[in-house]
Swiss-Prot record:
This is Serine--tRNA ligase, mitochondrial. Consists of two distinct domains, a catalytic core and a N-terminal extension that is involved in tRNA binding. ATP binds at R317, R318, E319, E404, I405, T406, S407. Residues 1-42 form a transit peptide. InterPro entries: aa-tRNA-synt_IIb (IPR002314), aa-tRNA-synth_II (IPR006195), aa-tRNA-synth_II/BPL/LPL (IPR045864), Ser-tRNA-ligase_type_1 (IPR002317), Ser-tRNA-synth_1_N (IPR015866), SerRS_1_N_sf (IPR042103), SerRS_core (IPR033729), tRNA-bd_arm (IPR010978). CDD domains: SerRS_core. Gene3D superfamilies: Bira Bifunctional Protein, Domain 2, Serine-tRNA synthetase, tRNA binding domain. Keywords: Aminoacyl-tRNA synthetase, ATP-binding, Ligase, Mitochondrion, Nucleotide-binding, Protein biosynthesis, Transit peptide. It catalyses: tRNA(Ser) + L-serine + ATP = L-seryl-tRNA(Ser) + AMP + diphosphate + H(+).
Length: 479
C-alpha cells in the first residue's frame, strides 16, 4: 500500500499545521541507538486542563479508585484537594472585592482635585495594592498545589474492570492450544536460537539486558516488524516512524509517571544546556505511544470521528529490579523493537475503537499460530492513564506458563486533557478520547514463535504469514 503526501495530509485534516503534513513512507526500517543516563522528572511547561469539578463532586469515588489501583499516597491527597478547592474559592471571594475597590479608588484619585483628600486616597490605594499582591501570592501557591495534586490523580476506571491485584485478572478468551508437548527435548528460546541471540557481547558493549540478534533471528525480527506494519496498514492504520526522543513533560502528560523509584521506566537524557536558555529535558520513549500521542499536542481536530496511526520504533525501558529465570533472554530487555497502534476518537466511539484494537491483536496472534489468552486486567495493573486494559499473553512452552505480548488501553480524555487535544464538529466539541495497543512487541513474539514452532530436528517452522518476508519455511535449517 503506497501512502502519498496528499493522503497523509487528508488523514490528519486540519489537526496539524501545513508544514507538518508531508510524509515519506520508508519501506526499509532504520534504527538509531542512543546513549543515555537517568535523571529526575521536570514539571510540564504548559498547563493541562484538569477536571477539578469532577474530583470535588466525586471525592469518595476518586479516593476509592486510587486505593483500588494501589495508589495509597495519592488517595490520601483527595481530602486535601477538596480543602484546597474550598480555600481557593474563599480567597477569590475576598480577593475580587479588593480588586474592585482598588479600581474604584484609582478612578477617584483621577477625579479628585483636593490635595488632602487625594493624599488619603493614594495611601489607601497603596495599602490595597499591598493586600492584593499578598492575596495573589497566596492564591498562586494554592492554585499550584491544587494543580500538582490533581495532576497525579489517575484516570477513572470503567465498571467492567476487575478490582484487585494481578491475580484477579479475568480470562476473556483463549486462542488456540499448545502446539508443543513438554518432553525431555523441549528447548527454550536461547537454546533454540543458539548464537542468533548474543547477550554476552551486548553486555560488554551496552550492559545487562541488551542483545545482538544475528542471522536467522535478525531476519525473523525484521520479518515480524514488516508483517505487523503491513497488517496494520491493510486495516486502515496510517504508518508513522516517530522520534524515539521526546520531552519529559510530554511523557508525563501521557501518564508515564513513576509510582516509585523501582517502577521508574524512563531513561532521561543528561545533556548540556546553556544557563541562558531554559529548555525542557528529554527522554527515550518506552513505547511509540508517547511520540504518537504528541502528534495531537495542542491540536484541534475538525469534522472529527477518528484518526488511527501505527508507529514502529525502538523502545527503551529501565526495567529496574527485573531479574530471575522468567525474565532471562529476550523477555525483558532495555532496548527492543515495537510496533504500536494509537487512535484518537470521538468520545462516543472509544469503546468501539477499544474492541477494534483488541480484535486486531487477536487476529494478528492467530495468524502467527501462537497459543494465547486474552485477559481483562485488574485495577492494580492499570497505568495512570488507562481506564481499562486488556493483555494478550502467549503460551511459552519452556517456562510452562503465559507471558504478556500485547496490551490495549482506553485512556478516555486523560491524555487529551494533558496534551490539549480537542475536536470540533458542527454539533459538538470537547476533548478527544485516546487509545493505544501493541501491534507487535518483537522480542517476546520471537520467544513465542521459536518455542511454539520448534521441531524435533532443531529447526523452527516459520508461520506461513511470515514466509514471504523471511523467504524460508524453516529457521536454522542446514544448507
Amino acid at each position: 500500500m503506497r501512502l502519498t503526501n496528499r493522503r497523509f495530509s487528508t488523514f490528519l485534516g486540519n489537526a496539524l499545521p501545513s508544514k507538518k503534513k508531508g510524509f515519506i513512507f520508508m519501506s526499509q526500517l532504520l534504527y538509531l541507538r542512543t546513549f543515555s543516563t537517568h535523571t529526575s522528572y521536570l514539571r510540564s511547561s504548559w498547563q493541562a486542563i484538569l477536571n477539578y469539578k469532577y474530583i470535588y463532586q466525586n471525592a469518595e469515588a476518586v479516593q476509592r479508585n486510587c486505593i483500588n489501583r494501589n495508589l495509597q499516597a495519592i488517595a490520601e491527597t483527595v481530602p486535601k484537594i477538596r480543602s484546597l478547592i474550598d480555600e481557593k474559592e474563599s480567597l477569590k471571594n475576598e480577593f475580587f472585592p479588593l480588586l474592585s475597590l482598588k479600581k474604584e479608588i484609582t478612578l477617584q484619585i483621577e477625579r479628585c482635585s483636593d490635595p488632602n483628600e487625594r493624599g488619603k486616597l493614594v495611601n489607601e490605594a497603596k495599602g490595597l495594592k499591598k493586600k492584593t499582591e499578598e492575596y495573589n501570592k497566596i492564591i498562586s501557591k494554592v492554585t499550584n498545589d491544587l494543580y500538582q495534586y490533581c495532576l497525579a490523580v489517575p484516570n477513572t476506571t470503567l465498571p467492567t474492570v476487575p478490582v484487585g491485584p494481578e491475580d484477579k485478572a479475568v480470562v476473556v478468551q483463549k486462542i488456540g492450544s499448545p502446539l508443543v508437548k513438554k518432553t525431555g527435548s523441549l528447548k527454550d528460546h536461547l537454546q533454540i536460537a543458539n548464537e542468533g541471540i548474543n547477550l554476552e557481547d551486548a553486555a560488554q558493549a551496552s550492559g545487562h539486558s541488551f542483545c545482538y540478534t544475528t542471522g536467522d533471528i535478525a531476519l525473523l525480527e525484521m520479518a515480524i516488524t514488516n508483517y505487523a506494519m503491513d497488517f496494520a496498514i491493510s486495516k486502515g492504520w496510517c504508518p508513522v516512524i516517530p522520534p524515539t526522543i521526546v520531552r519529559t513533560d510530554i511523557a508525563l502528560a501521557c501518564g508515564f509517571q513513576p509510582r516509585d523509584e523501582e517502577g521508574q521506566q524512563i531513561y532521561e537524557l543528561d545533556s548540556y544546556t546553556s544557563p541562558l536558555v531554559s529548555s525542557p529535558k528529554q527522554c527515550l520513549i518506552g513505547t511509540a505511544e508517547i511520540s504518537l500521542a504528541a502528534l495531537g499536542f495542542k491540536k484541534t481536530f475538525n469534522n472529527f470521528t477518528e484518526r488511527k496511526v501505527v508507529g514502529v520504533s525502538r523502545a527503551y525501558r529501565r526495567e529496574a529490579g527485573a531479574r530471575g529465570k522468567e525474565n532471562r533472554g529476550l523477555y525483558r530487555l532495555h532496548e527492543f523493537t515495537k510496533v504500536e497502534l494509537f487512535a484518537w476518537t470521538h468520545p462516543s466511539r472509544s469503546s468501539e475503537m477499544f474492541n477494534e484494537i483488541v480484535n486486531f491483536q487477536k487476529e494478528f496472534v492467530e495468524t502467527l499460530k501462537i497459543p494465547a489468552r486474552i485477559l481483562n486486567m485488574p485495577t492494580a495493573e492499570l497505568g495512570s492513564s488507562a481506564s481499562q486494559k486488556y493483555d494478550i499473553e502467549a503460551w511459552m512452552p519452556a517456562r510452562q506458563s503465559y507471558g504478556e505480548i500485547t496490551s490495549a488501553s482506553n485512556c478516555l480524555e486523560y491524555q487529551a486533557r494533558r496534551l490539549l487535544t480537542r475536536y470540533r464538529n458542527d454539533k459538538d466539541s470537547g476533548f478527544v478520547h485516546t487509545l493505544n495497543g501493541t501491534a507487535a512487541a518483537i522480542p517476546r513474539l520471537i520467544i513465542a514463535i521459536l518455542e511454539n514452532h520448534q521441531q524435533e530436528d532443531g529447526t523452527v517452522k516459520v508461520p506461513e504469514t511470515l514466509v514471504p518476508y523471511i523467504h524460508k519455511e524453516y529457521l536454522f535449517k542446514a544448507k
